[in-house]
Each structure stands twice: as structure tokens, then as C-alpha cells.
Amino acid sequence: LGAAYEKAHPGTKVDFNFAASGVLLQQISRGAPVDVFASADETTMDQAQQQDLLAAGTREVFAVNALWVVVPPQAKASPRTLKDLAGAGVQRIALGNPDSVPVGRYAKGALEAAGLWPSVQGKTITTQNVRQSLDYVARGEVDAGFVYAT
């Protein structure tokens, strides 16, 4: 995407800053230079808009994602449904911090909607971002983790 933009606009250099949406919002609110802010959730975009950090009329939904539960390749228990996460075979679940990480808010919301949050809340290991959840899963430090399909 950056290379295509640079090609279409000679002399322009695109720099990316990838981080959790809340972290990026804090950087922007403290004056970090930015031309495009792509948040992983509507809540963070709402906060940016409430803080007048978005140019009027520029907010657009340009992509969507799906929430996935992933398990380590060597997992003994392989949950197939959200309900399986409440079972005895799943002891630790990586979940982005619902207070600050969009994937965590979405995961908690899905578990609440399924009536499972009380059963799994004590099993959750909160992470700072999706990448950390995925790393915990890849290393087999948790039995499952919530990530985005992408």
C-alpha cells in the first residue's frame, strides 16, 4: 500500500507505525504527526473523533476483520466452539486487555454474548496486543488465544 502510494506520488515517503489502537490514539493525542489513523475498532475511532483528532468528513470504514480463536499446533485439547473454552481441557486463554485492546473488547463481548464470560474470565491471560496473544499461542504458553483472521 505504501509503495503504491509512493509510486503514484513521486517524492512522497510513507512511514508506517503499527501498534495497538489505544497506543496510537495516545500518540496522536500527544501530538505525534499522522496523516492516516487506521484503528482496529469503532470505539477508538469514536474517541479520536470526540477529541477532535480527525479532520471533518474524513472518517471511513475501509476494512473489516473477523475474530478467531487459535490453538497451539501441539495442543492436547482443541476447542471447536466458544463453549469448549469453558471446559476443563482449556486452562489458559490469551486475550487482549478488554480495557485497552480492541480484540480484547471483541473477544469479551463474544464470550459475554454466549454467556461464557464468567466461566472463562479466570482463565484469561491479558495481553497488550494481538501479536502478543499470537506469540503466547505459538510458544504453547496458553491453550487458546483470540486474534484477528488477518
Segments (PLM) and residue ranges:
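Exported/periplasmic ABC-transporter solute-binding proteins
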Residues: 1-18, 22, 26-30, 39-42, ...
